[in-house]
Amino acid sequence: SLVQFEKMIKEVAGKNGVPWY
């Protein structure tokens, strides 16, 4: 789903130190 996709992006971005909000 779109929610899971956004959550995945935020988790990956968080590991890279990039804020996705």
UniProtKB/Swiss-Prot annotation:
Cofactor annotation: Ca(2+)
Compartments where found: Secreted
GO MF, one example: toxin activity
Tissue: Expressed by the venom gland.
Assigned GO CC terms: extracellular region
The entry's keywords: Blood coagulation cascade inhibiting toxin, Calcium, Hemostasis impairing toxin, Hydrolase, Lipid degradation, Lipid metabolism, Metal-binding, Neurotoxin, Presynaptic neurotoxin, Secreted, Toxin
S-S bridge residues: none
pH dependence: Optimum pH is 8.0.
Catalysis: reaction(s): a 1,2-diacyl-sn-glycero-3-phosphocholine + H2O = a 1-acyl-sn-glycero-3-phosphocholine + a fatty acid + H(+)
Keyword Lipid metabolism tagged: yes
Dependence of activity on temperature: Optimum temperature is 30-45 degrees Celsius.
GO biological process per UniProt: lipid catabolic process
Stated family: Belongs to the phospholipase A2 family. Group II subfamily.
The protein's name: Phospholipase A2 crotoxin basic chain
Organism of derivation: Crotalus durissus cumanensis (South American rattlesnake)
